[in-house]
Amino acid sequence: MDNYIKTALRATGEAWTVFKTSASTGQNPKLAFQQLREKYKGTDVEGYVTDYTKICEEELPRIKNAETYMAQAKDVGNKVFQVFKASAKKVFTDEMTDDDWNRIIKAASDIGYSNWDSEVKEYAKSYSAIVVWELDRQYQRIHNIREDWYKYV
């Protein structure tokens, strides 16, 4: 579990660097994001990296002021990753109850809703959602569960 979190954190940092650089310079990040997706292909964080880099790509056209946006997005990202990290410990070690999942979903949703009126609202909503999806993917993988409930939401 610790290795998974370290890998996810490293991948997030690499994607964040591309995202921040692209927002500041206006450079097209498609190739850099594709290289990151290739780098993590076949690893446990492949789905997470794919989803996160796509969010970053989708957000770039929405950014009006890179400095303000990136400061807000960094704060959101740190909060979301803390939910991810704390929840992953439970996902990797225990059977999850509906109450456990509801707490994770609420914690992630609260971050999205608390940024509803900010420039980073789409980033906050999307990133918090992929964290819940990623935790579910890992839980299913670890416990060999085949149902993909999130495909029906």
What does each model-found stretch correspond to?
Residues 4-11, 15, 65-80, 145, ...:
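Disulfide-bonded cysteine-rich modules in secreted/extracellular proteins
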Residues 42-74, 119-146:
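Repeat-associated, polar segments at repeat-unit boundaries in modular proteins
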Residues 16, 74-95:
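Amphipathic, heptad-repeat alpha-helical segments
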Residues 1, 28-36, 45-52, 100-101, ...:
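Extended non-catalytic scaffold regions that mediate assembly and binding
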Residues 20-28, 41-46, 91-96, 113-117:
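Charged, low-complexity interaction regions
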